[in-house]
Amino acid sequence: MNISQIAKLTSLTAKSIRLYEEKGLIIPPLRSESGYRTYTQQHVDDLLLIARCRRVGFSLDECKAMLTLANDPNRTSAAVRARAQEKWQEISRKLSELTMIKQQLEEWIASCPGDQGSDCPIIEQLKGHCCSNNKTKTP
């Protein structure tokens, strides 16, 4: 398979596939006599795993670790679960932070009259000045 075929099968761009090769996530494919990359089913399987890992938020380094585990016949499910648990905890922390940011923005929006006047409590909050009865919070 050439890069355009594997890109279609995996829904990845050729650029992403070359990046994953460059970063060592996939083994370099063999080259045809004309210099084109020739991919195998193992490449497809590895790239699909990488794509799924990326969709759930794994970094390239984390994808590489998951790929190593996936291709290790001696892996334990405990090791795989630990990696997934770490990612879940990271995402949970980020969600909490985003929830606080969302609440802050909701408060600021509610405090702003949104009229033609130049006074804006949102700007005052962003400048760090206290206005009205709103509290300055930093998420």
UniProtKB/Swiss-Prot annotation:
Domain HTH merR-type: 1-69
Gene3D superfamilies recorded: 1.10.1660.10
Biological processes per GO annotation: positive regulation of DNA-templated transcription
Compartments (UniProt record): Cytoplasm
List of residues binding Cu(+): 112, 120
SMART domains attached to this UniProt entry: HTH_MERR
Domain of life: Bacteria
InterPro entries reported for this sequence: CueR, DNA-bd_dom_put_sf, MerR-type_HTH_dom, MerR_fam
Keywords associated with the record: Activator, Copper, Cytoplasm, DNA-binding, Metal-binding, Transcription, Transcription regulation
GO cellular component, one term: cytoplasm
Record flagged with keyword Kinase: no
Classification via Pfam families: MerR_1
Molecular-function annotations in GO: copper ion binding; DNA binding; DNA-binding transcription factor activity
DNA-binding interval(s): 4-23
Assembly and interaction partners: Homodimer.
Role: Regulates the transcription of the copA and cueO genes. It detects cytoplasmic copper stress and activates transcription in response to increasing copper concentrations.
Domain observations: It contains a N-terminal DNA binding region and a C-terminal metal binding region.
Protein name as catalogued: HTH-type transcriptional regulator CueR
